[in-house]
Each structure stands twice: as C-alpha cells, then as structure tokens.
UniProtKB/Swiss-Prot annotation:
Record protein name field: Adenylate kinase
Binding annotation for Zn(2+): C130, C133, C150, C153
Residue numbers binding AMP: T31, R36, K57, L58, V59, G85, F86, P87, R88, Q92, R160, R172
Organism ancestry: Bacteria, Pseudomonadati, Pseudomonadota, Alphaproteobacteria, Hyphomicrobiales
Family affiliation: Belongs to the adenylate kinase family.
Family annotation (PANTHER family): NUCLEOTIDE KINASE
Amino acid sequence: MRLILLGPPGAGKGTQAQRIVEKHGIPQLSTGDMLRAAVGVGTEVGKRAKAVMDAGKLVSDEIVIAIVSERIDQPDCANGFILDGFPRTLVQADATEAMLKAKGLDLSVVIEFRVDDQELVRRVDGRYTCAQCGTVYHDTDKVPVEEGVCDKCGSTHFKRRPDDNAETMIKRLEVYYKETSPLIGYYYAKGKLRSVDGMAEIDQVTTEVESILSKL
C-alpha cells in the first residue's frame, strides 16, 4: 500500500495519515523528517544535503528524491508507506515515479482532500499541536477533553506554528495552486487519483479514505 495524500495545507492530510498509520501499520514519510534523519545519521546523501544547507542553499530535487529512495528501502516500508507533503511539483512527481519504477514498485493510489479556501484559512488560523506527540488540536473544532492536557499522551505542552495564521495561509495557498495543484490532473490521467470531501467531519473523512483503501 503505497500512498500519496494530496491537498492544500489545512485539508486534514496529517490527521488522516495518523489514522492510516495506526490502522495499517505503514510509516508516514515526511521529507522534512527524512532529511533531518539522513543528515543526523550521516548517510552519503545526508552529507550532501548538509553541505548544501550549510551553504544556505535549498536542497535540490535530486537530493530529496535520493533521500526518499533511501528511506523507502528500509524494512518498515516493505508493506507500504504514506508520502506526506511530497511530491510538490510535476518535476518531483515524474522523478518519484521513475525512482519507484527502478525498484519495481508503483503507487497504489493518490488521495485528494477537497476543502474550500475559506474553510482552510479558518482551520489553520486556530490550529495548534501537542509539543510532545504532535496530535493536532483547534481552538473551536477540537480541544482536549481535559483542558490543557493532550488526549493522546498526557502532555501539558502545546505549540502553534508561526505560519499558522490567515495572512501566511493565503500566501501558502497561492503557492499550492501554482505548484502542487497540477498534480491532481497528473495523477487523474494515470488513473491513480481518488477524491474525498475534506469538508466532512473527521470520522466521515476517515470512512471515505478507508473505503478507497479497501479496494486496493
């Protein structure tokens, strides 16, 4: 089960990815986490990435693909994985497909989360997470059962991302529609795209996602 979750920031991809991980036991692969791990461990590609970052430059698609490739080769990905926040562009999508093909692998499905812009801005403007386990909360939509205590791990420490505000969100959406939304047509043309209503309640979205996964 090799998945890509596609949709604008705030569409609920992270929440649904967590649920897929818990139910199906496949890892959620974030390029940021993979990059930090590769640099920390000091793999060959990690050293290349560190040299680029130390020079204050952006890590190239080539290096990111190499890091994703390296991560997919690890044993916990044998039964599948979820790509989180990647690919972001058509160039990255082509490179990802070529990388998987070289391993004799293929994507199982790409799930698109559809949410209108006004709702996305509202969601992100009130979002915060548990600093310990990363569980996502919202000022009005999802607060901890016990005030100030994470439902999942019991931590009392929470954090808000500096860019989780309306002004920044509007800019992020502009980038998404320019660079990432073309992937919807790309994967539709390949017969890989399935869409869910990201405006629905979280549990209903999960039901839709599981319905898609059950047909794989």
